[in-house]
Amino acid sequence: MAQNDYFVIVYQVLKYLYECLKKGEKPEACYLTASAYNIHENYWQYIILSLITEEYVKGIAVNHTKDGVLLGDLPDAIITPKGISYLFENSLLEKAKKTLNAVKEMVPFV
């Protein structure tokens, strides 16, 4: 899987939100942006809207405008129990995890 693959990004987002939950911290908005994953804004919005629709994430405000979608309240994002279950039980997310680990081995500073 490529680093910009849907399941790789979903894994990273859910893993980050789960770590924030366990630490009792609010997520930093800078980690919940398209630029954090080097992807196009439309692709990022698709991913986040999918996570919200599937009820894996909640707390993000979605505002539909004539120019598109605005995502707000990013520091209020939280992974749901359904999202935690998906994180640990989805085989495609396991492949994404392996992809990220392989990249870290090749590029130590990632």
What are these regions (language model features)?
Residues L17-L21, L51, L87-N90:
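Generic structural signal for hydrophobic core residues of well-folded globular domains
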Residues D67-A102:
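Short, amphipathic alpha-helical interaction segments positioned at domain boundaries
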Residues V103-V110:
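Short acidic DE-rich linear segments
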Residues A29-T33, V62-D67:
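Short linear capping/connector segments at secondary-structure termini
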